[in-house]
């Protein structure tokens, strides 16, 4: 569910929020496929208009006293003509296509048992990339991956969740946010539509009834 939770990044990831890479006060949206199984969420860095919540440091992931020793990490070029600088596309059930600034990647996971999953990351470039562009893609690969400046927090929080659920194997809980609809929203990413779309697909192929 991590990659389908389109609003968690701005709340959890200090790097995204502090250095204004991907935030909810940028233009963006989320588009679901017709069957709702697949989705893409996106944001446009150039449209940032800092919201009061961020300026007043009410978002805990905003650490504005932080700075980079190598700020050139964020000196991205515009790779496409749609202004999109961050996107996550999921292909049901376990394939993800990712764009973060100029870092292009494919990731997928392989279950290794009931309590173990292996996650693979494949970083991409173009044959037409200049040496400078190739160097930038390699540098920005440090944002994600197993020990990425952004992704390391995902590994941490997922471990917390796994430990918590192991402690109560016979219990269940559910928190409903924003209704039950799974539909596209091209004005906001503060939605659980993609998560619902995934479970809609899961129910369908497993033969479960809603």
Language model segments and positions:
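C-terminal catalytic domain of Rieske-type non-heme iron oxygenases
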Residues: 1-210
């Amino acid at each position: 569910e991590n990659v389908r939770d389109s609003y968690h990044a701005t709340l959890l990831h200090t790097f995204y929020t502090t250095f204004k890479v991907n935030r909810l006060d940028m233009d963006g949206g989320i588009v679901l496929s017709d069957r709702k199984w697949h989705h893409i969420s996106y944001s446009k860095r150039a449209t940032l208009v800092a919201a009061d919540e961020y300026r007043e440091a009410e978002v805990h992931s905003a650490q504005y006293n932080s700075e980079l020793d190598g700020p050139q990490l964020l000196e991205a070029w515009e790779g496409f003509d749609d202004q999109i600088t961050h996107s996550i596309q999921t292909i049901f059930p376990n394939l993800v296509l990712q764009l973060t600034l100029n870092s292009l990647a494919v990731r997928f996971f392989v279950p290794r048992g009931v309590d173990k999953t292996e996650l693979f990351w494949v970083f991409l470039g173009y044959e037409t990339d200049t040496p400078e562009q190739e160097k930038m893609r390699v540098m920005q690969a440090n944002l994600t991956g197993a020990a990425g400046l952004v992704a390391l927090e995902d590994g941490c929080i997922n471990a917390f969740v796994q430990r918590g659920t192991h402690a109560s194997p016979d219990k269940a809980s559910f928190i409903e946010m924003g209704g039950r609809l799974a539909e596209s929203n091209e004005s906001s990413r503060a939605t659980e539509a993609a998560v619902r779309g995934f479970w809609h697909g899961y129910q369908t192929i497993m033969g479960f009834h809603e």
